[in-house]
Every structure is written in structure tokens, then in C-alpha cells.
């Protein structure tokens, strides 16, 4: 069977180029995502799940796995993070916050005002402009594993990454390159004794400080 991607169903709006590009991206990722969701749903049902499997879309909403338009799940992870941050902010009585999602090589930022977030109708992926509703999230090309280095007299961060292994210098896995995580540890923004992450022991502030002093200080 062929996977059919119809532009009028994927992006039912004016804009021939954007609509076509969105339909093409949907066709490119559609078969893989569709198969994955089918296998996942069947596995969950076999394990005893008695409810529908719902998938988050890039606009922060939910849709049944069987009705998912694959391309509309792009940036669904950051989107649901913003939705969760807005809920937590309201519960804490702080409706105006900046939500940040820091990954290994990128960081994503969204503004939440009065408990609500903004939406964007378009996004650019690999220079292709796609038309889809999505939570307005700004990406920055630096994450927790991004390595800091000096270019002449300028401090730069990224694009190289320490990755998960060996990871930042403070992990104690043999790396001596300073990362964003090392900087946050030295600045006491991270609790060395209680790091977030499965399997991580206590972090080493001295190793982080030595890496910074050696390479960028």
C-alpha cells in the first residue's frame, strides 16, 4: 500500500508553496510514524491498556493515534512542555513565566503570559517553510552538552557537543571540555548532589571548574 499525503487535508489553507512543502514532509515521515504508532498502540493494548492512545500535536492538543497526521507531530515534545509549564505556573499562582526546555544541543524557549501561550502558523525546517499550527517556541543552538570554546578573543558555544558519553566534564567520564552544564554547576544553578537524570551520581564541581579555567577562562 502507498501512503497518501493530500495537501488539502494536511494544510487546508491558502499558500501553494507552504501547503505543498507540508504535504511532502508528511509523505516523507508518514509511513515511519504511522507504523510506529500502530505497533506501539497494539503493544499497549496487549499489555492491558483499555483506553485510546492519544498523541500530542505541535499545537499542544491531543488526537487519537489512529487519526494522527504525522507531520503535525513535529515539535510536539516542546509544545507539550509549554502546556505543562503553563499549567504548573497557574497552580503556583505565577501566570507570567518563561518556559525553557534544555536538551543536549538545543534549547527551546516560550513565553507564557497570563497563563496562555502564543501560536505560530508556520515553521521553517531545513529551509523549507511549512504551514501548520504550532505552539510558538524559539530554538537556540546550544544545549546542556554544547561545548564552550574560544575563537580568537570571542567565547563561543557549540556546535560541538560532549553528548551523553562522555558527557560534560562534571560527569567524571573522562571529558575535560567545558559545557553549558558545567557552567550551570559552577554557578550553583544545579545541585551537585542531586542531579536530574537517571543513573547519574553526584556531579563533580571541581572537574567542571577546571575545564572552564583550562579552556575558556
Label each PLM-derived region with a short phrase.
Residues 1-217:
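N-terminally biased helix-coil "hinge/interface" segments that flank
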Amino acid at each position: 500500500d502507498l501512503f497518501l499525503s493530500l495537501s488539502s487535508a494536511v494544510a487546508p489553507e491558502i499558500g501553494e508553496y507552504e501547503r505543498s512543502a507540508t504535504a511532502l514532509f508528511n509523505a516523507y515521515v508518514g509511513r515511519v510514524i504511522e507504523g510506529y504508532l500502530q505497533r506501539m498502540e497494539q503493544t499497549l493494548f496487549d499489555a492491558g491498556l483499555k483506553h485510546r492512545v492519544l498523541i500530542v500535536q505541535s499545537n499542544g492538543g491531543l488526537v487519537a493515534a489512529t487519526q494522527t497526521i504525522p507531520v503535525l507531530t513535529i515539535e510536539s515534545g516542546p509544545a507539550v512542555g509549554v502546556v505543562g509549564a503553563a499549567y504548573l505556573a497557574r497552580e503556583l499562582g505565577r501566570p507570567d513565566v518563561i518556559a525553557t526546555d534544555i536538551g543536549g544541543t538545543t534549547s527551546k524557549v516560550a513565553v507564557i503570559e497570563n497563563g496562555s501561550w502564543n501560536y505560530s502558523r508556520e515553521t521553517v525546517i531545513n529551509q523549507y517553510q511549512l504551514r501548520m499550527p504550532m505552539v510558538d517556541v524559539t530554538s537556540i543552538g546550544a544545549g546542556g552538552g554544547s561545548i564552550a570554546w574560544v575563537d580568537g578573543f570571542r567565547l563561543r558555544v557549540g556546535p560541538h557537543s560532549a553528548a551523553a558519553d562522555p558527557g560534560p566534564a562534571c560527569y567524571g567520564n573522562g571529558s575535560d571540555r567545558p559545557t553549558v552544564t558545567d557552567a550551570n554547576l559552577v554557578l550553583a544553578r544545579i545541585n551537585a548532589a542531586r542531579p536530574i537524570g537517571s543513573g547519574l551520581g553526584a556531579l563533580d564541581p571541581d572537574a567542571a571548574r577546571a575545564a572552564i579555567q583550562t579552556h575558556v577562562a
